[in-house]
């Protein structure tokens, strides 16, 4: 998976298109990512001992990894490629050529 936790990304599809935010969680088995402030859903929680009233909680839902582009340090969005630098496999931005890792 080309996106990692902590990457700054731009959403390129969906209702939050154009939003730039940080990846909170990567889910490689289902090829999805949770992005801060994107795809907010309302989750209804049952009453419990900690929360006797119950509540409606807003949280981020996962979106497909193909709907985001990774930004480099200069804010250029592009596809991610892999190359070997000094014996290590690193990710780089194909548009700007800048190493991401």
Curated annotation (Swiss-Prot):
Gene3D superfamilies per record: 2.30.30.30
Keyword Ribonucleoprotein: yes
Organism: Streptococcus thermophilus (strain ATCC BAA-250 / LMG 18311)
Keywords from the named record: Ribonucleoprotein, Ribosomal protein, RNA-binding, rRNA-binding
SMART domains from the UniProt entry: KOW (SM00739)
Function comment: One of two assembly initiator proteins, it binds directly to the 5'-end of the 23S rRNA, where it nucleates assembly of the 50S subunit. One of the proteins that surrounds the polypeptide exit tunnel on the outside of the subunit.
Family: Belongs to the universal ribosomal protein uL24 family.
A GO MF term: structural constituent of ribosome
Pfam families, sorted: KOW, ribosomal_L24
Assembly behavior: Part of the 50S ribosomal subunit.
UniProt protein name: Large ribosomal subunit protein uL24
Keyword RNA-binding among record annotations: yes
BP term (GO), one: translation
Gene Ontology cellular-component annotations: ribonucleoprotein complex; ribosome
